[in-house]
Amino acid sequence: MIKIHLSRLLGAHRMTQAELSQKTGIRAATINEMYHELIERVNLDYLSRICEVLGCKVEDILEYVPDSYKMQYRADRQN
């Protein structure tokens, strides 16, 4: 499973989803899907744009979590 830490990064930068959308040229709906970890595929160009705007690395946005932790992660998100 891949976790997306966009919500944490935007909070750290005190930036809204709308501001990130405007600065990157990425559709607001796509930013929202990434923010809520609902997106199934991530465009590499989008990652590059986000990294440029937020001054971060790809590994700051994406994290690989072994599938053995998937069930616990889902349970934690529902609580």
Predicted segments with their positions:
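A short, Lys/Arg-rich alpha-helix, primarily the initiator
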Residues: 1-16
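Short, charged recognition helix plus adjacent turn
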Residues: 8, 62-79
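The alpha-helix within a helix-turn-helix
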Residues: 10, 21, 51
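DNA major-groove recognition helix of helix-turn-helix
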Residues: 10, 35, 46, 65
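Short alpha-helical DNA-recognition segment
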Residues: 15-33
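Helix-turn-helix DNA-binding elements, focusing on the entry/boundary residues of the two helices
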Residues: 17, 44-47
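Hydrophobic micro-packing sites on short alpha-helices
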Residues: 46-51, 61-62
